[in-house]
């Protein structure tokens, strides 16, 4: 795997607050290798290690994308939701930024059925067919469509399980992470000082609560994904 330059610098990471962890009482001892200090009751992440892990992860993401691998980005908490959607749209990959529906991956046949229903309803709406139905039936189907859009809108073009899943908050998305582990789908996780680095395949120690921190990490990963995808298109 070729090492590339992703313009990752410590000053930018500090400005984004990537180094701020949780209170020292909430830490996971397994995060000790990634923590450099305690400050005012808060653990401080070692940014030198974070920068190295992020750079290595970008190399891996580029390599996977250049081979046509499919990505799913997951982040459902309010601070991450919009950033996840923007990042995924930019990278032209799938995303979940609202509630993770249990079994979304492990019970893929059910998810696939819902996606078919979602696509059919969208097609009927675009064709104006819903307006031809009795008001009560039309209203019911529109509510159904709205519900599906909220929870499945980011994966509406997914035709199979993803090859790699990027998870913004290990604690918040634990169900999604467990499904990936069950299915053997590789995961890339942002891990704060209260997380377990052993649960994910690739871990990036970082503040997963600050918008600026989440944005910075996602931007780097998406840049690698976009470059890899462009390489795949050129060489196809």
UniProtKB/Swiss-Prot annotation:
It is found in: Plastid, Chloroplast. GO terms for molecular function: structural constituent of ribosome. One of its GO terms (biological process) is translation. InterPro entries: Ribosomal_uS2, Ribosomal_uS2_bac/mit/plastid, Ribosomal_uS2_CS, Ribosomal_uS2_flav_dom_sf. Keywords: Chloroplast, Plastid, Ribonucleoprotein, Ribosomal protein. The keyword Ribonucleoprotein applies. Pfam families: Ribosomal_S2 (PF00318). One of its GO terms (cellular component) is chloroplast. Belongs to the universal ribosomal protein uS2 family. HAMAP family: Ribosomal_uS2_B. NCBIfam families: rpsB_bact. This is Small ribosomal subunit protein uS2c. It comes from Piper cenocladum (Ant piper). The gene is rps2.
């Amino acid at each position: 795997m070729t090492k590339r330059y992703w313009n990752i610098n410590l000053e930018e990471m500090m400005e984004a607050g990537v180094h701020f962890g949780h209170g020292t009482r909430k830490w996971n001892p397994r995060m000790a290798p990634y923590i450099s200090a305690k400050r005012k009751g808060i653990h401080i992440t070692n940014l030198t290690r974070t920068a190295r892990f992020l750079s290595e992860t970008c190399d891996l993401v580029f390599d996977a994308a250049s081979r046509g691998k499919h990505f799913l980005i997951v982040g459902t908490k309010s601070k991450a939701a919009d950033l996840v959607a923007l990042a995924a749209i930019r990278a032209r990959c799938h995303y979940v930024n609202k509630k993770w529906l249990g079994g979304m991956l492990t019970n893929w046949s059910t998810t696939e059925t819902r996606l078919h229903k979602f696509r059919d309803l969208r097609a009927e709406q675009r064709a104006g067919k819903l307006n031809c139905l009795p008001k009560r039936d039309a209203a019911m189907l529109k509510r159904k469509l709205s519900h599906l859009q909220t929870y499945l809108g980011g994966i509406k073009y997914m035709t199979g399980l993803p090859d790699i899943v990027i998870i913004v908050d290990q604690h918040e998305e634990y169900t999604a992470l467990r499904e990936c582990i069950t299915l053997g789908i590789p995961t890339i996780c942002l891990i704060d000082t209260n997380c377990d680095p052993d649960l994910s395949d690739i871990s990036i120690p970082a503040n997963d609560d600050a918008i600026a921190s989440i944005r910075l990490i996602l931007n780097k990963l998406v840049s690698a994904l976009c470059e890899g995808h462009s390489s795949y298109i050129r060489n196809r």
